Structures are given as structure tokens and as C-alpha cells.
Amino acid sequence: MRFFRFLVFPVIAGLSSVLAAPITSNDTVDGSGEAPETLLQNSEEQPHQRLKFYNWDYKDLGTTAFEDISFPARQPPVAVNQSEQCPDGWLRFADSCYWIETELMGFAKAERKCFEKQSTLFVANSLEEWDSIRSHSKEAYFSWIGLVRFTHYEKSEQLPRWQTEGAINPTKMNWLIKPYKPIVNGWTSFANCAASYKSPATLESASYTFFYPCTYLLYSICERNSTIVNVMQ
């Protein structure tokens, strides 16, 4: 029954504007007894406009979640290559390192936290990478990834955009409703940001991707690789 609630609620959300992440009143966050309403709170953090290497132009997003803010000073980036290990606590896949963030944050703060680690939100360059990394995310919860759909392109462009170039076609991902269409997968003018849900069930099809308001407090995944490091310097 618990699995059924996780699977059905987002469908309703996609058809009737936007609801909260599909967690019921009987669930708690991370077993700590924290009320699930925490996930429905709006984060006061606001995404930045200062990282020019991002493909995103936040002025094209029809939401106050994307406004200019002051940004912390950049730290010297750390290169990643095949012969080196990832920092403690990071996962390794090919030439990238990944951080599974278990602090609940709005999209903006998640993006900033990744940047402070000389990384971006997770951008999948292959389906193998996508399946491998999201399998390490926290079960029964959503994690922000580096994927948004701009309001400005609502009529001319169906696909969301990744935070960096060279990523997989988003339609190939495990969206809740297939074939991919933005509206039925939760997108509205104020639900621009994509999150990945990892089901506690062993059935792979129970995990999915869905759009939510960027101010929802979710977990997140950071990625650091040599390409990103070179651009950030």
C-alpha cells in the first residue's frame, strides 16, 4: 500500500497542477520523526545567474525561485582523472565523482552546495551512468538533478535542458508517464525542476523522474568531472 501511494500521487499532481512530493502523513523523513510537511516547505534560497558555463538562463523561467543572489567565492577546483580516487564519501563512475546529498534542500541551495564542492548537479551522459548513479540515491525519496524545463520555451520546446552539454536525451529517462510529455510528468510554469525518485521496491520501473516546484526540499546528487573542472577554472 505504501508503494502504491508513492506511485499514484505524482500522476494526480501532473494532471492537477502541482502537489507535494508523494509522501503521506504516515511517513517520516529519514526515520527521525520529522513531519513530512518539511518537504512541502519553501526554501528561501534562490538560484544564481553567475555561472556562465551553465546552459540555463534563469530569466526564461516563469518562477520567482530563480532570481539573482550573491554567491560564495570560488574554491580552487580539484581535477578528476582515471588514475585518481574520488574524495572520501564520493562515488566513482568512469571519469566522474558523485556526492549523494542527504540534506533536504530547495533546488537553489542544492545547486549552490554542489558548486561549493567544485561540481554541478548530476548530469547523465549515458543511460548506464544514469542507472548506476541514481541507484545509490536514498530510497523512497526524491533527489534533485541538473535538469530543468524553461517556461519561455513552453510552446516551442518540449524537452527540458541539462545543466551542462553532452548529456543524454531526456526522453530516454525513466519518466513516470511514458512516452515523455512535460505536463503529465508534473511540469507547470512553477514546477520547472526535475527530481529522481528511487523506489524501495525491487521493481526498477517503480523508480521514476518527475517535475516539482524548485522550492521543494529534497535530496540531491552532485557530479564532479574533469570537463566541469576545466570550465570552472
From Swiss-Prot:
Residues covered by the C-type lectin domain: 93-223
Keyword Zinc attributed: no
Superkingdom of origin: Eukaryota
Keywords: Disulfide bond, Glycoprotein, Lectin, Proteoglycan, Signal
Signal peptide: 1-20
Gene Ontology molecular function terms on file: carbohydrate binding; pattern recognition receptor activity
SUPFAM superfamilies: C-type lectin-like
Glycan attachment sites: 26, 32, 81, 225
GO annotation, biological process: immune response
GO CC terms of this entry: external side of plasma membrane
InterPro entries found in the cross-reference section: C-type_lectin-like (IPR001304), C-type_lectin-like/link_sf (IPR016186), C-type_Lectin_Receptor_IMM (IPR051379), CTDL_fold (IPR016187)
Disulfide bonds: 114-222, 193-214
Pfam short name (any one): Lectin_C
Name of this protein: C-type lectin domain-containing protein 87
Organism, scientific name: Caenorhabditis briggsae
